[in-house]
A protein has these predicted regions:
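Hydrophobic helical h-region of N-terminal Sec-dependent signal peptides
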Residues: 8-17
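Short, polar/charged alpha-helical segment
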Residues: 38-56, 168
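Ligand-binding pocket segment of bilobal, Venus flytrap-like solute-binding proteins
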Residues: 69-71, 77-81, 154-238
Length: 340
């Protein structure tokens, strides 16, 4: 996509970057994007097909989870192509009940997230479970230079729901006595912290997830947590949403458990979905689904071969796989192929 503008939409929500593509405006679509690579890839692929295949004017607004999802619920964004639904279950269910969004099926069939330690450190000290981390001598291995006497677990970005989930987990598991729940500031900084520690041979204690390109380059061991339980998760997410709305002082005792392996989903605003002429777009997004191994390949291409160019990554995917042609009519596919 040829991006014509790059600006901060302060009048929509602070800190979000909006990019608009040049097209014939046969339709207009506003995509919500996030500040991590897998979401960026899906937005780039979907946006390229919408522009080149459907002739749409595509606007993409990028930001953290909270403002982007709020904009979707508020009908300011039309479509989000990667939703970590189980991290947002209360918000999603509430907005489905309110009629502000519709769900459009599965994007990526399998994803994981959790707390990880580098394999050499895990093997040397027998670190298998989060309870194994509750030791002052172990915490010293991951010393936080900004919090003397505590270790550091590099966590999510504060604008991501998982940051607050991890905050609650730290309290429930008793990790907060030994570690800070450190906000690295951006997805790129999180990756850099892990990759940099590996390069220097330093211990790593971090939240992380798949699909990502980095996972194929570093050797991380996922720590065991209490087994996933739906009732426990639902109870915990109520506390999480209360903290997100009112601050950490409203924390109350709850249970906690591991993140469930989940399918990532897609959603659209009901305002966009209610327009009859948008049906072909919704049909395309419903059909859009990429197997996890293919997402990992695209992430690796983005990191290693694209020069950090997400459009080139989208074009590489479209030029080298055929699965996307099943998502769209033949004439749309032909236009996309001709543009590559």
């Amino acid at each position: 996509m040829k991006f014509l503008r790059n600006l901060i939409l302060s009048f929509v929500f602070a800190g979000a970057m909006s990019l608009t593509t040049s097209a014939n405006a046969a339709c207009k679509v506003h995509l919500g994007d996030f500040d991590w690579d897998s979401a960026n890839i899906h937005t780039a692929i979907a946006g390229y097909i919408l522009e080149k295949g459907y002739g749409c004017e595509v606007e993409s607004t990028k930001g953290s989870t909270t403002p982007i999802m709020a904009a979707l619920f508020d009908q300011q964004i039309d479509i989000v192509t990667e939703v970590w639904r189980d991290n947002l279950v209360q918000l999603i269910e509430d907005n489905l009940a309110k009629g502000t969004i519709i769900e459009l099926g599965v994007n990526t069939p399998s994803s994981t997230q959790g707390f990880y330690v580098d394999k050499p450190t895990a093997a040397k000290y027998g670190l298998k479970h989060v309870d194994d981390m509750k030791n002052a001598d172990i915490a010293k291995l991951f010393a936080d230079p900004e919090a003397p006497g505590k270790g550091r677990m590099t966590s999510c970005i504060s604008g991501w729901t998982c940051y607050t989930i991890n905050l609650v987990k730290h309290k429930v598991y008793g990790l907060d006595e030994f570690y800070t729940n450190f906000d690295p500031g951006s997805g790129g900084a999180l990756d850099a912290a892990i990759a940099g520690a590996f390069k220097k041979g330093k211990p790593v204690f971090s939240y992380y997830w798949t699909p990502t390109g980095l996972m194929g380059k570093v050797d991380l061991v996922k720590l065991e947590e209490p087994k996933y339980d739906q009732a426990c998760w639902d109870e915990m997410t109520k506390v999480v949403e209360d903290i997100k709305a009112n601050g950490p002082d409203v924390y109350k005792d709850t249970c906690a458990c591991e993140y469930v392996n989940m399918s990532l989903t897609k959603a659209a605003s009901t305002k966009f979905a209610s327009v009859a002429s948008n049906k072909p777009i919704l049909d395309f997004i419903r059909a859009y689904s990429i197997p996890t191994p293919d997402v990992n390949k695209s992430l690796a291409f983005y990191m290693d071969e694209s020069g950090g160019d997400m459009e080139e990554t989208a074009k590489h995917f479209l030029a080298n796989t055929g699965i996307w042609k099943k998502w769209v009519p033949a004439d749309v596919a032909a236009k996309v192929v001709a543009s590559l």
